């Protein structure tokens, strides 16, 4: 029988090194590239304000930035670009003169309009000429009365309308009252006064009087003396006959 094989120096087995290497590979993770994002500041802006599309988590090795209007850079019009080596903005076909690209890749919109709302994509190129892109949203709403909420504006409009309606109703009432009063006065002026009878005042001031007695047939105050005694006729009251 041959002599037993000698153990490796140091007491280590070859397979033990393989186990250590496998353990290190299990717990080691290669570094990953953080995807940059786009954030609108403010998230919803009023028409006529300025908005910044902020580029977050941008790598320091970026050599160029290109902003496109659309959900992707491919096939979307170029707004503007920025070259870090020359530190200059390069306008594109969709440039309106209100956009500015900063050295960190952020895009500033000045005096935005409702037509500016939509998706915007930033495409970056690093020193190795690798390209990456991210998309953000720009929200624009109509500008209301400064300092007043929508409910307050609606209340003011309602109050003004109610006030106008009350004033119109008051004017109509005054016109109708004046017209009615003038009509009554005109009717009174046009109505002829009642005819008055001679010797009497107007009908509304006349008083009812008893009918005058019909005149009796005048009879002579003398009659044939039926009695020869004259003293009897001397006793006749002639004044009573005249009055009656």
UniProtKB/Swiss-Prot annotation:
Membrane topology recorded in Swiss-Prot or TrEMBL: Single-pass type I membrane protein
Region (Disordered): 186-215
Post-translational modification: N-glycosylated.
Annotated keywords: Glycoprotein, Immunoglobulin domain, Membrane, Signal, Transmembrane, Transmembrane helix
Keyword Membrane (UniProt): yes
Record-linked Pfam families: V-set
SUPFAM superfamilies reported in the protein's UniProt record: Immunoglobulin
Gene Ontology cellular-component annotations: cell surface; membrane; plasma membrane
Tissue expr: Granulocytes.
PROSITE patterns: IG_LIKE
Signal peptide: 1-35
Domain Ig-like V-type: 36-139
GO annotation, biological process: phagocytosis; regulation of immune system process; signal transduction
GO molecular function per UniProt: protein tyrosine kinase binding
Extracellular membrane side: 36-155
Glycosylation, residue list: 57, 104, 111, 126
Transmembrane segments: 156-176
Spans within the Cytoplasmic topological domain: 177-244
Protein's cellular compartments: Membrane
Note: To study the function of the orphan receptor CEACAM4 chimeric proteins containing the extracellular bacteria-binding domain of CEACAM3 and the transmembrane and cytoplasmic part of CEACAM4 has been used.
Family label: Belongs to the immunoglobulin superfamily. CEA family.
Subunit structure: Interacts through its phosphorylated ITAM domain with the SH2 domain-containing cytoplasmic proteins involved in signaling processes during phagocytosis.
Entry function: Granulocyte orphan receptor that acts as an trigger efficient phagocytosis of attached particles.
Entry protein name: Cell adhesion molecule CEACAM4
Source organism (scientific name): Homo sapiens (Human)
Lineage: Eukaryota, Metazoa, Chordata, Craniata, Vertebrata
């Amino acid at each position: 029988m041959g002599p037993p094989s000698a153990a490796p120096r140091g007491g280590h087995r070859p397979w033990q090194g393989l186990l250590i290497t496998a353990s290190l590979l299990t717990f080691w993770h290669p570094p990953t590239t953080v995807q940059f994002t786009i954030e609108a500041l403010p998230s919803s802006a009023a028409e006529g304000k300025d908005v910044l599309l902020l580029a977050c988590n941008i790598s320091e090795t970026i050599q160029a930035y290109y902003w496109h209007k659309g959900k992707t850079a491919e096939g979307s019009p170029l707004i503007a670009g920025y070259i870090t080596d020359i530190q200059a903005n390069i306008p594109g076909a969709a440039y309106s003169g209100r956009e500015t690209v900063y050295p960190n890749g952020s895009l500033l919109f000045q005096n935005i309009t409702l037509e500016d709302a939509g998706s915007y994509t930033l495409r970056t190129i690093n020193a190795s000429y690798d390209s990456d892109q991210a998309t953000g949203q720009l929200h624009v709403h109509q500008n209301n009365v400064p300092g007043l909420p929508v409910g307050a504006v609606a209340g003011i409009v309602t109050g003004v309308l109610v006030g106008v309606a009350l004033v119109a109703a008051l004017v109509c009432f005054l016109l109708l009252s004046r017209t009615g009063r003038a009509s009554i006065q005109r009717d009174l002026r046009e109505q002829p006064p009642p005819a008055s009878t001679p010797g009497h005042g107007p009908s509304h001031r006349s008083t009812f009087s008893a009918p005058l007695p019909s005149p009796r047939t005048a009879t002579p105050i003398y009659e044939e003396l039926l009695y020869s005694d004259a003293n009897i006729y001397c006793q006749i009251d002639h004044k009573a006959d005249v009055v009656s």
